[in-house]
Design a protein with these regions (language model features):
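Conserved acidic donor-binding segment of nucleotide-sugar-dependent glycosyltransferases
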Residues: 327-338, 347-352
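Membrane-proximal helix-turn-helix segments that form the acceptor-binding/catalytic region
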Residues: 81, 107-111, 123, 137-157
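Conserved donor-binding/catalytic core segment of Leloir-type glycosyltransferases
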Residues: 158, 199-217, 222-226, 239
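Carbohydrate-associated surface elements
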Residues: 34, 163, 184, 269
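Nucleotide-activated donor-binding/catalytic signature segment of Leloir-type glycosyltransferases, i.e.
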Residues: 241, 248-276
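Acidic anion/phosphate-binding donor-loop and adjacent secondary structure
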Residues: 169, 175-176, 184-203, 218, ...
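Nucleotide-sugar-dependent
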Residues: 11, 217, 266, 271-278, ...
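N-terminal subdomain of nucleotide-sugar transferases
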Residues: 1-48, 397-398
Length: 398
């Protein structure tokens, strides 16, 4: 697998890698970004994690993002080609962003190795929101070409939800290449295990956001909403876990609003096992996404993870969320409306019975879209691509 991510914090990459590594006839190596100053290689839950000597760029400069991607691509290309040359490669699974990481597998692909492109986020819409639209028509056209070429190069393409699937179909991507593998929490990790939580009145009311700290995902809206209701909810606390390009700006916003004693930021991204333990201790998960072309294609995984852990969620009325959920399962607010978000948090605080009812109803989602079913789909995809015969490298070389 190849992914421009830090392995310990990426639930989807870990879940898929661990699923395949659990099969007796598969060995999985994952090429990812380094977590610290030095790149390490280690084994975790049966997966060989190979950190490449590239750190994640967190900023707003388009060219610096592109350079970081290209440097990672070059490192991944060398590793992937090396595995193929040593006859230890049978299948390549590439996670976007960006899509062009599939070119790390260009040599194996030319010699018949199958390549899976796992589209977490559609690049065109994500970049339009990240960089405030496209001022450069050539850049926008380039992204469309990049998506088309990479999808042509891939043997199969994984989408994370049905709206994303339809968008790619509308753009002319062959239906036979596409499949939906939703970003569902692994019940082996994301479950309450019958744990009893402390009564709310013993520790105040605790809100949590966990994920990328960026303005396009609305964390500033959540901070302002907390400021609106700070006097209405005794013991209100808001915890923000993650990293991102706008963290310093949101820290300053919190200080300006005199929320230092209420809003708390983690120093860095938190490993998956630690974040699970943290979220279990919370009363409400906040998903404050803004409304834009990217979030209208996105089913927030943090919402699903919170629900899987038995924690009610507050979410914006966006197409992908309303496609899968109703007001009987989650607390909805109007997107980009601070007052609506504040009122919804206050409503959730006051309505303990409502919180419990929504959690009971949310179980219907996981009954319909069970990870165990998607897990079998993923394994089936791997087996179908792995069984196709190809000549060994030694017969192809002169």
């Amino acid at each position: 697998m190849i992914a421009y991510t830090t392995y310990l914090t990426d639930a989807r990459v870990r879940r898929e890698a661990e699923t395949i590594a659990s099969l007796p006839d598969y060995r999985v190596s994952v090429f990812v970004l380094k977590e610290h100053a030095e790149a390490n290689t280690y084994i975790l839950d049966g997966v060989e994690v190979v950190e490449l000597n590239v750190a994640k760029y967190r900023g707003k400069n388009t060219m610096k993002y592109l350079v970081s991607y290209i440097v990672f691509l070059m490192h991944a290309f060398l590793k992937c080609t090396g595995k193929y040359m040593s006859n230890t490669l049978d299948l390549v699974h590439v996670h976007n962003m960006p899509n062009f990481l599939v070119f790390a597998a260009i040599i194996p692909r030319l010699f018949g190795i199958k390549v899976i492109l796992d589209i977490h986020d559609i690049l065109i819409e994500t970049y339009a929101s990240k960089f405030n639209g496209f001022s450069n028509r050539l850049f926008k056209y380039g992204l469309h070409v990049e998506e088309w070429i990479c999808c042509k190069l891939a043997s199969r393409i994984i989408c994370t939800n049905h709206l994303q699937y339809q968008t790619l179909v509308d753009r002319g991507i062959a239906v036979k290449k596409l499949m939906v593998l939703m970003n569902l929490p692994d019940p082996a990790k994301f479950c309450m295990n019958g744990e009893k939580r402390n009564p709310m009145n013993q520790r105040g009311f605790r809100l949590v956001y966990f994920g990328t700290i960026t303005k396009r995902l609305g964390i500033d809206l959540a901070i302002r909403a907390v400021n609106e209701i700070r006097a209405k909810i005794p013991g209100l606390q808001f915890y923000i876990y993650g990293s991102g390009e706008d963290r310093d700006e949101f820290l300053e916003l919190s200080r300006q609003l005199n929320l230092d004693a209420i809003v708390h930021f983690s120093e860095h991204a938190v490993p998956l096992e630690e974040i699970i333990s943290i979220v279990k201790s919370m009363d409400l998960v906040i998903v404050p996404n803004r409304k834009n072309v990217a979030t209208e294609q996105m089913l927030p995984v943090k919402m699903l993870e919170g629900l899987a852990l038995g924690i009610p969620v507050v979410v914006p009325r966006l197409k992908p969320i309303e496609y899968y959920f109703t007001g009987e399962q989650v607390f909805f607010f109007e997107p980009e409306n601070v007052q609506s978000l504040a009122m919804t948090i206050a409503q959730a605080y006051q309505d303990k019975i409502g919180r419990d009812d929504k959690m009971k109803n949310a179980k219907k989602f996981f009954e319909k879209y069970a990870w165990e079913t998607h897990k079998l789909d993923l394994i089936g995809l791997y087996r179908s691509l792995s069984t196709e015969k190809r000549p060994p490298l030694r017969k192809l070389l002169p």
